[in-house]
């Protein structure tokens, strides 16, 4: 639905309150939503140093420029209603290029050119490059010649009379002749040696021969640097000597081992060190099969296991108890004590509680028919039981079978009163 609205009413809505013109780059304050031209509001804030809105004086904080936002909707509406007037620029007319002029060379402009420079360039002979010594000695003469040439060129530019040109060419020729004579005299003094003979071609020839593979590297190194090769040979000989020494030592050790294995202990003991002797003793003990040495580690290991592990034993009431009433058999006759360092008096206290006795001194414990001291530890008691058992025999047992035949048996009975004489 189309509605006709006057431009004046729209102009009032789309105009800036600072410059009273139609908005250009509409910019709105986010706090109060008043819209201005971007240029106008920026200049107002920065130049007048205000921190409030120019219309409603609302506070914009310490950074008012951050509260400004571009309003694209108003800008699009302004572009549709009040289109920007574009200036019509007249197209530039066709500029006619000037006619081409004939270019003249620089040589045609010069009236007279001196012929001395051309003659000097053509009459110079090509000579071989001089050595460093010649360059050092002839540097002063060349500098003087260059100075004269530069001064001569300046004179040529300034003067063009034939008399001055002739004088200059004569002076220049004389200076060149003197310079050549001095260089030739120095060459004669050096001994008329050719330039090629003075050059040292040895390193280049050596590189060519090495690249072609015709000459070995060792011979050239020995000829070129004698001191370095001698030093390298000495170090190689020392390294080879140390290698041979270590090899000889290894061979000697192997021979001594072979002799000791064959049965010559006297010779090996006199020559071999202490470490070799200990290893030979161990080998001889294992090879000969000495029965006395073999069970020793087993016994020590078994003893160590007994010292660390618990102690199993069985308590049995004595059948032939003299005197008063005999002690009954306790129900749990197989017992285990974790700490083997406990004394026999601990077993006496256990029996006193089980049998309801008044004192532990009423009980006497025997092992293998002999009375046991109450202060004796269980580990020592096990050692005594093993010593008195039958000939240290080994018995085969299956895993899970009864250990009744392998446990220590302790017999308890009522202690007889001591008779006072």
Swiss-Prot record:
Class of this enzyme: transferase
GO molecular function terms attached to this record: ubiquitin-protein transferase activity; zinc ion binding
Top-rank lineage group of the source organism: Eukaryota
Gene Ontology annotations for the cellular component aspect, listed alphabetically: nucleus
A biological process term (GO) from this entry: response to water deprivation
Basic and acidic residues bias spans: 178-198
Substrates-to-products reaction catalysed: S-ubiquitinyl-[E2 ubiquitin-conjugating enzyme]-L-cysteine + [acceptor protein]-L-lysine = [E2 ubiquitin-conjugating enzyme]-L-cysteine + N(6)-ubiquitinyl-[acceptor protein]-L-lysine
Keyword Lyase: no
EC annotation from Swiss-Prot or TrEMBL: 2.3.2.27
Span of zinc fingers (RING-type): 16-57
Swiss-Prot/TrEMBL keywords: Metal-binding, Nucleus, Transferase, Ubl conjugation, Ubl conjugation pathway, Zinc, Zinc-finger
Disruption of the gene: reported phenotype: No visible phenotype. Drip1 and drip2 double mutant shows delayed growth and development, but increased tolerance to drought stress, compared to wild-type.
SUPFAM superfamilies in alphabetical order: RING/U-box
Protein role: E3 ubiquitin-protein ligase that acts as a negative regulator of the response to water stress. Mediates ubiquitination and subsequent proteasomal degradation of the drought-induced transcriptional activator DREB2A. Functionally redundant with DRIP2.
Stated name of the protein: E3 ubiquitin protein ligase DRIP1
Organism per entry: Arabidopsis thaliana
